Curated annotation (Swiss-Prot):
Function, in words: As part of the central apparatus of the cilium axoneme may play a role in cilium movement and thereby cell motility.
Main localization (coarse): cytoplasm
Domain of life: Eukaryota
Composition bias type Gly residues, residue spans: 1205-1220, 1260-1271
The gene coding this protein: CFAP74
Coiled coil: 100-159
Pfam families with a match to the protein in the record: Ig-CFAP74_3rd, Ig-CFAP74_4th, Ig_CFAP65_4th, Ig_CFAP74_1st
Biased amino acid composition, Low complexity: 63-90, 535-548, 1287-1304, 1373-1414, 1913-1929
Designated name of the protein: Cilia- and flagella-associated protein 74
NCBIfam families according to UniProt: choice_anch_D (NF012200)
Gene Ontology terms: cellular component: axonemal central apparatus; axoneme
Acidic residues bias locations: 1227-1236, 1272-1282, 1321-1335
KW Transmembrane (keyword) present: no
Subcellular location: Cytoplasm, Cytoskeleton, Cilium axoneme
Length: 1940
């Protein structure tokens, strides 16, 4: 594309500037590169210091090198291209920085500064550490000096303190060694300090060396700035030159634009001239049209004059026949009277005949009337069936037609698809492609060969076209041929045409609009006539066709604009994509416009205001260009400008705009834009003109509207008033207006027209004759019909008769066709003109309707107005309907209402009404009321005569005052039945100038004003103070009119429910009211109440009551629960207050269907205290068919009474099973007639619906009101189960269906009422199965109800359930209070009678008989009224099917199942908003441990939307978790039970109980091993890894120098899958002589909760024969292994070190003596079982080392072991203890038997009570030998018998505890290993110790095992008697031996 001169000049200027900028950039880069090279060649400070030459020497050397052309080593002498202004090279003054880069020099300087700071910090740190080390050395020296002083003092002390001297010496040695080490540290710190100081000094020196670089850096920067300023000045000069050249070019362009503007102005002048010429032509056409219209108006006036003359003639003809018609009518009336008289006579005769025949004439007549009514009903039903059959047939026809249309549509679609596939399918496309290739290639081939090495040239392969090919220059014949292929309806699309051809295309408006090209037709063919007798099918078809045409036209108009510019269907954007799109639009808008701010205010909105706001082109003509100007006004704060960006592309061919660039407009200044519209099709357009201002885009709406017809009818109903006299006519008009510009044709028609009347529309020659004949014929037919008794006929039938009979002779003449303008519609006396015509745009047509009645009857005509547009024949226009109504009358004077009905009238009241008399004639007439003598005094007419003016009315006032004498005076006017007391009195108005009188009828019904009250007196009985007691009062209205009554002047405490004593009672209705009374004081009270009515009547009722103070009162008797959503629970509470000095028992009887729970509902209130009772309301879901709203509320908060209630307190009339009382006589028995044989009262006439349901059986009441009846009750009992129970009557008890309790039988009479015992239902299998089935059914019901609630989102959101419940609280009388033991246990007292259902009544009777007349009074009652309201929740949980519902708690249960501890599981729940407002969700706080938690934040939920809540479960311990999640909105709380179990990694160890008993490895020789097997099983549902870990108990006495564990496990770790087991081998290998080895094996599992600990025990011996059980002495502590090393080396330690044998022995004895104190096990580790010896083995863990030390000290001394008796004894008791001896069997060396010799007990020991009881082979002194086989182990049992009385030599005799000691010597022989004692064996002494307590054992203290109580004293003498006595004692069974 070639550039203009201006563009080329600008390109050249900018190219030069780019070259200069590139040269400057290259120069700067070269300078920087050379600076870097010079910096690399600079020597460092260390190099300069190494050369030993200062900086000045280096500068001189460089200068000399530069002069001589040489360079020093390491420095490259390259010239620098950067020169100063004087041509000199810029250089730095300092030697090391000569020619260096400034930036690099800066960085180097910063690095040096950082190094100095770092060295300074290190120096400070090292200095601080050196100071600390110096202080420490000084302190240590001072401490050593003080120790030296103390050593000198100790040396001088007498006697010397050797131990202190040794300690001081040791401290001196330690402190001296530490001092030497600290001094070495101090020396190192000093050296480090010197090093840090040297580094700091070096860094400071280098910093000083670099100090001059700062000045040189500044100088270099100044030189660089000067160079840049010079370059900028050069660039500015070049820019000035470019600007000058651009200004010259701009001036040339302005001159060119001026020339263009001049040319445009010439073109505009030529257009204006053409427009003026077109306007002149239009004026001429308008003048011609106006002339034609005037001619049409003149011809119309002539036609109107002719029509008026014709109508005058017709009216004159009608007036001539008026006299004949009147005579005929009079004759017909006389005939009718004669026939009526004859009929009455015949009826009277038949009446007499029937009476004589003994029949009831009324019955016969009534049966005849009923048969006639049945016949009429049968006829109506038959007609209805026929109509329904027609409708069904029509529906079937419509369905068949729709089905046929669907089949046709499918066939058309299939055919279209086949044609498309045949013409546009792949095969057709391939064929067309091949044909095209064959026609346009040289060789006629369908494909070119692309495989050649050289591509073919197009000129060689294809046919060469002319230069006009593809440029719109095709020959005309080719274009015509293509257009013929497309068809006549196809037009070129303007959008696809070139711009120069768009305005020249000639399009057909009708074709484009899709309205057809059919030729014109007349009104019959084009508009058609409505059907004469249209059937339902035809009407529906016509309506459907019109709707389809309207919808298709609207769819065409809607899609007309979119057809030009279609858009591909795309998917809907997601929320994220919409956000991105909005952000992009915001960024785009910010880029194209900036906000305007003036003086701190930012302008918002569009900156320009168009005037007019909408550019509208109305009623346009296709092809005619219309222009509109719009002013664009700047309304912003500052100057602004705009430009037009265009019009949408789909409307560019019809809309255009023109404007001048406005420049910047000041605020308030406007610019003009001219919009031109050239319509090419009658299509509505809605678009806008897009403009862009500095502040952003804005638009001007454009609306283009075609010509349309807006038709309306006013009025739609034409009424001719009260009536028109026969022979006269009345005229009314209605108007059809067209508020649009489209001209339409209208036609009036009626479906009531007959064929002849339709033909009459087009004829005018015999119209008058036909009308006259029709009138005469109609009158004759009416007379004949009246004479024959057929009754009057309709106007349509008269017209048909006239046309059919009278017009027949004239048919031969042939009717003449009238012009369209003269056609009139006539039917039934109505004539409408005109009925056909044209309605131009913005005009209206007035239609004249004339009504000339031919019969005295009402007439009605329905007119249909249809329209069509001649210019748009396919346009469907709406139809209108006009209703014409009129009435024909015989005489001119008539009454407006022939029946004056006073309705129902009360006796003694005055009533008025008006009789309006109208005169339809042409002259005034006199009227008089003909009086009746029997009406005198009752009816009065004022005035009784008067004159009625022509066309006016005359009112006559009628006054009526009925009295009781009226019915007697007017008894002949009473109509049947006489009980109704209805009077119908015939009256007449006499008109002298009129031959016929005017009849009218007076009608009235008489009634009285009485009210009946039942009972006539109110007895409230005993009334509890503080609450209201109610009785029922029936108010009955015997009259026939409703009455309004009210009880006035009520005394204090009396209240009526409802409406506070005011009411409205209907005729014959018995209205029930609850009269409640709250006594203000205690005691009997008498008063009366008065009721008054609006009729002026007053009635008085006497009342009496007795006030009673209750022992327990409620804090509030009324409770209103808040509106509770279904699934939620609301809680309130009341307080029971006991004001007496005795405890009071109570029970609440809660209705079963109330959804209320009271807790506790049964209990006791302590004296002078309060008890809180909680009331929970959990509404159940609605059931199917349940209506919303409130049921009839209970009548009163207390019990209603019957009319015959006598004494006694009131009871509640509600659903709790309580009822009214009976009246008792003096003997306490019910009066006769008060109850039936079953003990029920007759209260059916006074029970409210709520009293029918008996909920919960109350405490102390019978089973009549329980939840279910007894099994043996019959139907009558079931029906009466809900009646009000009677106090004092016995009834069979019933079991509660809920299974919670069964009621006790009710006691009879007033002889006593026992409180009911609460019994639990037996827990058997059948009961469990039934309970489970009932629970499952309840759960299914609740789930179904919840689903209904969730599906009620589209239902009524205002559903609610309001109920009111009265709950009775029974207070047990004080005489039946429970015993103190029962009060303490908190149980309710039980009745003495059995509570089973079979014997309940008999037991109750027996109890009543036994109690006698002195029985306690019945329970007192107080009442609580609770109002509840249940609503639908707005927050609903969309629970999945697997989420169970708990009906008891009314919530879903989300079970996470077992989850490993520490693992997190997340579940999703979906909440839905079923309300009408957005919900803000919230949640109540949960457990702080965060086991259950909400993962996501709660967001607001829109109406109808849902929200997902994620709940997590993270167990922290191995336990079950249960928590309630409460999600709440403003009105609803949604409870969700969260359940889960934390399962820790758990392993099961086997054998069973191994963790408690442990593993006993047995007795093992040192060096050998023993093994046991342990089974580890994974019982968790996931794999587990485990590790075996030994606690490794250590002892100071046995330091384990070999570092070997006695116990080991294999495998020590592993991983087990779910259910997998593994065997672990535990080995025991003793490493030294230790009698007892103990350890704890811990099985470690990751994340375990409970420790798995297995105690391990074993015994290691170096010798085969051993003694197990006693405590071995503790060895001497050897922390430094001196004894062990000396024993290994065979060197004896000096006594000062070893402590000597005596010391060792003493230490061992002391340790043994201290062995009583048991060791405390480690926390969390279960201590092993205590051996029979009783002493703990924790402190004897190193017994082998003690034994070795004892053997080394002296082998001749026997080892002493300690055997402690496990329990202390008292005098006279016997205690036993045992230990084991055994011989080992070696696994390597075989086995050998052994022997243990037991020395004989000394005599003093036997006398003291010691004995050897086991083995029994011992002698009298206890001595003997115990043979031991290899591997055998035997027990030896010792017993001690305490003396019955301690002798004075014993410590116990003085009241202190003491230890009794026996030393038993054992000799160990044999075995595998050689004993240390030689052939004689090894001696072992067992010291047995038993603790003896003074006194005797307390009586309550049990005897421990192993202790025998003191026997009976036995007389004995001699020293051997005690021993003998001991021998005779039977030893107790040996305690279980300790497994070691």
């Amino acid at each position: 594309m070639a550039l203009t001169a201006e563009e080329a000049y600008l390109e050249e200027l900018w190219r030069e500037e780019d070259e200069q900028s590139e040269e400057a950039t290259a120069m700067q880069q070269m300078l920087a590169h050379q600076h870097e090279q010079q910096h690399d060649a600079l020597p460092s400070y260390q190099e300069l210091m190494g050369q030993g030459s200062p900086a000045v020497t280096l500068r001189r050397a460089k200068a000399a090198a530069a002069a001589n052309g040489t360079s020093s080593p390491g420095i490259r002498g390259s010239p620098s291209p950067a020169r100063g202004p004087g041509g000199r090279l810029p250089s730095l003054a300092m030697g090391p920085t000569v020619g260096a880069n400034v930036e690099q020099l800066k960085r180097r300087l910063q690095t040096v500064v950082a190094e100095v700071e770092g060295h300074q910090q290190r120096y400070d740190k090292v200095l601080l550490e050196a100071n600390k080390a110096t202080d420490l050395v000084h302190s240590m020296e001072a401490e050593i000096e003080s120790l030296y002083v103390e050593a000198e003092e100790l040396a001088r002390r007498v006697p010397p303190a050797a131990e202190r001297q040794r300690q001081v010496a040791t401290w001196l040695a330690q402190r001296s060694a530490a001092l030497e080490a600290q001094r070495q540290v101090l020396g190192g710190k000093q050296l480090e300090l010197i090093e840090a100081e040297a580094a700091l000094r070096a860094a400071e020196t280098e910093l000083d060396f670099m100090a001059e670089a700062r000045n040189e850096i500044a100088a270099a920067q100044a030189a660089e700035t000067a160079a840049l300023s010079a370059a900028a000045a050069t660039l500015r000069g070049k820019e000035d030159k470019a600007v000058a050249g651009y200004r010259r070019k701009q001036a040339a362009e302005a001159a060119r634009l001026a020339d263009v503007a001049a040319a445009a102005e010439d073109l505009a002048q030529r257009r204006i001239q053409a427009a003026e010429e077109a306007q002149a032509q239009a004026m001429e056409r308008l003048k011609a049209n106006t002339e034609r219209i005037r001619e049409g108006i003149a011809s119309g006036r002539d036609l109107l004059a002719a029509e008026q003359s014709r109508r005058r003639e017709a009216v004159l003809g009608l007036k001539e026949s008026l006299a004949a018609v009147q005579a005929d009518v009079a004759q017909q009336a006389e005939l009718a009277r004669v026939l009526q008289r004859q009929r009455r006579d015949l009826q009277e005769k038949e009446f007499g005949a029937l009476v004589e025949a003994g029949m009831n004439p009324y019955e016969v007549f009534r049966r005849r009337d009923q048969e006639a009514a049945a016949a009429r009903q049968h006829e109506a039903i038959t007609s209805n069936i026929a109509t329904r059959q027609l409708e069904v047939a029509a529906q079937l026809a419509r369905e068949q037609e729709a089905y046929a249309q669907k089949l046709a549509a499918r066939k058309r679609e299939k055919k279209t698809r086949e044609i498309f596939d045949r013409e546009m399918g792949p095969a057709a496309q391939q064929a067309r492609t091949e044909a095209y290739m064959q026609a346009h290639t040289v060789g006629g081939v369908s494909m070119l060969d692309p495989t050649g090495r050289v591509q073919p040239f197009p000129s060689e392969a294809v046919v060469v076209k002319t230069r006009r090919f593809g440029r719109g220059g095709a020959p005309e014949e080719v274009l015509q041929q293509q257009l013929q292929r497309l068809g006549d309806d196809t037009q070129p699309k303007q959008l696809l045409l070139p711009a120069k051809y768009r305005n020249t295309a000639d399009t057909d408006a009708a074709a484009v609009a899709g309205l057809g090209r059919g030729g014109g037709s007349d009104d019959e063919d084009g508009m058609g006539s409505p059907p004469r007798s249209p059937s339902l099918t035809q009407q529906l078809a016509a309506t459907q066709q019109s709707l389809t045409a309207t919808a298709s036209l609207a769819q065409q108009q809607q899609q007309a604009a979119g057809d030009r510019y279609k858009q591909l269907a795309t998917r809907a954007l997601t929320k994220h994509e919409q956000g991105l799109m909005e952000a992009a639009k915001t960024r785009h808008k910010g880029g194209i416009g900036a906000p305007q701010t003036q003086m701190g205010r930012t302008f918002g909105g569009d900156a320009f205001l168009p005037s007019p706001a909408v550019v509208e082109f109305k009623d346009f003509d296709v092809g005619r260009t219309v222009s509109a100007s719009v002013q664009i006004i700047n309304r912003s704060y500052k100057k602004n400008t705009f430009r037009v960006t265009g019009i949408p592309v789909e409307y560019c061919d019809v809309l255009d705009f023109a404007y001048k660039l406005p420049g910047y407009l000041a605020p308030g200044v406007s610019g003009e834009v001219v919009i031109s519209f050239t319509p090419k099709a009658p299509v509505d357009i809605d678009t806008s003109l897009q403009l862009l201002a500095d502040t952003g885009p804005f638009e001007v709406p454009i609306r283009c509207r075609t010509k349309r017809a807006a038709l309306s009818v006013s009025p739609s109903a034409v009424d001719f008033g009260a009536g028109v006299t026969l022979g006269e006519c009345a005229t009314r008009t209605f108007t059809i207006a067209n508020d649009g510009a489209l001209e339409v044709e209208f036609r009036l028609d009626s479906p009531q027209l007959s064929e002849d009347e339709r033909a009459l529309l087009k004829s005018t020659a015999n119209m008058a004759h036909l009308m006259t004949s029709a009138t005469v014929a109609a009158a004759a037919a009416a007379a004949a019909a009246t004479a024959s008794g057929q009754g009057p006929r309709s106007a349509r039938s008269f017209a048909n008769m006239g046309v059919a009979d009278g017009a027949a002779p004239e048919t031969d003449t042939g009717p003449l066709v009238a012009p369209r303008e003269e056609r009139r519609l006539a039917h039934g006396g109505f004539t409408v003109f005109p009925c056909v015509g044209h309605l131009k745009g913005y005009s209206k047509v007035t239609f004249t309707v004339t009504f000339a009645p031919v019969v005295a009857a009402p007439a009605k005509l329905l007119l249909h107005a249809s329209y069509k547009a001649p210019a748009m024949k396919r346009l469907a226009l709406p139809h209108h309907e006009v209703t014409l109504t009129g009435t024909g009358r015989d005489v001119p004077v008539y009454v407006e209402r022939p029946l004056i009905d006073f309705q129902c009238c009360m006796l003694g009241h005055l009533y008025r009404d008006v009789l309006v008399v109208r005169n339809g004639g042409k002259s005034a007439m006199k009227v008089m009321v003909v009086p009746r003598p029997e009406l005198e005094g009752f009816f009065e007419f004022s005035p009784d005569f008067g004159f009625v003016q022509a066309g006016d009315s005359f009112p006559i006032t009628i006054r009526f005052k009925p009295t009781p004498a009226l019915l007697h005076a007017c008894r002949k006017h009473v109509v049947e039945p006489e009980e109704e007391q209805i009077l119908e009195i015939g009256m007449r108005l006499s008109v002298p100038d009129q031959s016929l009188p005017v009849p009218f009828t007076l009608r009235a019904q008489i009634t009285n004003t009485d009210l009946l009250f039942q009972p006539p007196a109110l007895d409230f009985g005993d009334c509890v103070m503080g609450e209201r007691t109610a009785v029922k009062l029936l108010v009955r209205n015997p009259g026939r009119l409703p009455q309004t009554f009210g009880f006035v002047g009520l005394p204090s405490g009396l209240h009526f429910t409802p409406n506070d004593g005011f009411g409205y009672v209907l005729p014959g209705e018995a209205l029930e009211r609850l009269v409640s009374f709250q006594p203000p004081i205690a005691g009997p009270q008498t008063f009366s109440i008065t009721a008054k009515t609006l009729a002026g009547r007053s009635f008085t009722l006497p009342c009496r009551a007795n006030g009673v103070a209750p022992p327990v009162v409620l804090s509030s008797n009324r409770v209103r629960m808040p509106a509770t959503p279904i699934g939620d629970t609301r809680t309130v509470s009341v307080v029971l207050i006991n004001k007496t000095d005795q405890p009071q028992s109570y029970e609440f009887a809660v209705p079963a269907d109330s959804d209320l729970t009271l807790s506790p509902h049964v209990g006791r209130v302590p004296p002078q205290s309060r008890l809180r009772v909680q009331i929970d309301y959990s509404p159940r879901p609605p059931v199917d068919g349940e209506q919303q709203g409130a049921l009839p509320p209970p009548s009163a908060p207390n019990t209603a009474r019957g009319p015959r209630d006598g004494g006694g307190g009131g009871a509640m009339a509600n659903g709790n099973g309580s009822g009214g009382y009976e009246h008792y006589n003096d003997d306490g028995e019910p009066e006769d007639g008060e109850g039936d044989a079953d003990g029920h009262t007759d209260t059916d006439s006074f029970q409210s619906p709520s009293a029918r349901a008996s909920p919960v059986q109350p405490l102390g009441r019978g089973g009549r009101g329980g939840r279910g009846g007894a099994a043996g009750e019959d139907e009558d009992e079931d029906e009466d189960a809900g009646e009000l129970p009677v106090r004092g009557k016995s009834s069979s008890s019933s079991k509660a269906s809920s299974g919670r309790r069964s009621s006790s039988p009710q006691l009879g009479g007033r002889q006593g009422l026992a409180m009911g015992r609460i019994n639990e239902v037996p827990d058997d299998d059948d009961a469990d199965a039934e309970a489970e089935a009932a629970a499952e059914a309840e759960q299914r019901t609740a789930l179904a109800a919840l689903k209904r609630i969730q599906s009620m989102g589209g239902g009524d959101p205002g559903w609610y359930r309001w109920r009111e419940h009265a709950i009775t609280c029974y207070i047990k009388p004080q005489s039946q209070n429970p015993t103190p033991s029962q009060s303490q246990s908190g149980q309710a007292p039980a009745a003495s009678a059995p509570s089973d259902g079979a014997s309940g009544a008999a037991a109750a009777a027996e109890t009543a008989a036994s109690s006698g007349p002195a029985a306690a009074p019945p329970p007192q009652e107080i009442h609580l009224q609770v109002a509840t309201c249940a609503v639908l929740p707005d927050l609903v949980l969309l629970a999945p099917p697997d989420l169970p519902y708990v009906p008891l708690h009314q919530c879903h249960c989300l079970d996470f199942g077992p989850v490993p501890v520490g693992q997190r599981v997340v579940r999703r729940l979906e909440l839905a908003n079923e309300g009408e407002e957005p919900l803000v969700l919230g949640a109540e706080s949960m457990d702080s441990r965060e086991v259950f938690g909400l993962v996501n934040a709660l967001r607001p939920v829109r109406p109808g939307a849902s929200f997902r809540v994620m709940v997590s479960f993270t167990p922290q311990a191995r336990t079950e978790y249960l928590e309630v999640l409460v999600l709440k909105s403003a009105r609803t709380r949604l409870r969700l039970a969260l359940k889960g179990a934390g399962i820790a990694p758990e392993l099961q160890l086997g054998p069973e109980g191994v963790t408690a008993t442990g593993l006993d490895m047995g007795d093992v020789l040192v060096g050998e091993a023993a093994a046991r097997t342990l089974t580890v099983t994974n019982v968790c549902p996931f794999p587990l890894s485990f590790t075996m870990r030994l606690a490794g108990k250590a002892s100071a006495a046995d330091p384990n120098p070999t570092m070997r564990q006695a116990f080991s496990c294999h495998p020590a770790e592993g991983t087990l899958a779910q259910g997998e087991s593994c065997e672990v081998a535990v080995s025991f290998t003793p490493f030294s002589q230790r009698p007892y080895f103990e350890d704890v094996l811990q099985v470690v599992v990751p994340n375990q909760q409970d420790q798995l600990l297995v105690p391990l025990r074993g015994r290691g011996w170096r010798e085969a024969v051993f003694v197990a059980g006693p405590d071995y002495p503790e060895p001497q502590p050897d922390p430094f292994l001196l004894h062990h090393l000396a024993k290994q080396a065979g060197v004896a330690l000096p006594p000062s070190v070893s402590g000597g044998g005596a010391a060792a022995g003493g230490a061992a004895v002391a340790a043994a003596a201290a062995g009583d104190k048991p060791s405390t096990p480690a926390p969390g580790i279960k201590p092993p079982a205590t051996p029979p010896g009783g002493a703990s083995k924790g402190k004897a863990a190193a017994a082998a080392a003690a034994a070795a030390a004892a053997a080394a000290a002296g082998a001749s001394e026997p080892r002493e072991l300690t055997l402690n008796f496990p329990h202390a004894i008292y005098p006279g008791e016997v205690a036993t203890a045992s230990f084991d001896v055994g011989s080992l069997k070696s696994t390597a060396s075989g086995s050998a038997p052994g022997e243990v010799g037991v020395a004989e007990l000394p005599a003093e020991a036997r006398e003291a009570g010691w004995a050897v009881t086991d083995p029994p082979t011992a002698g009298a002194g206890g001595g003997g030998k115990v043979p031991l086989a290899a591997g055998e182990r035997k027990p030896i049992t010792l017993s001690y018998s305490a003396p019955a009385a301690p002798h004075p030599g014993m410590v116990a005799a003085y009241g202190h505890a003491e230890y009794r000691v026996l030393k038993l010597q054992l000799t160990l022989k044999g075995g595998l290993a050689a004993l240390s004692g030689g052939p004689e064996g090894r001696k072992v002494v067992v010291a047995a110790r038993c603790r003896l307590l003074p006194g005797s054992r307390p009586p309550g203290e049990p005897v421990p095992p192993g202790v025998t109580p003191a026997p009976e004293p036995v007389a004995a003498s001699g020293p051997g008697a005690g021993a003998a006595g001991v021998k005779k004692l039977v030893p107790p069974p040996s305690p279980p031996k300790k497994a070691v």
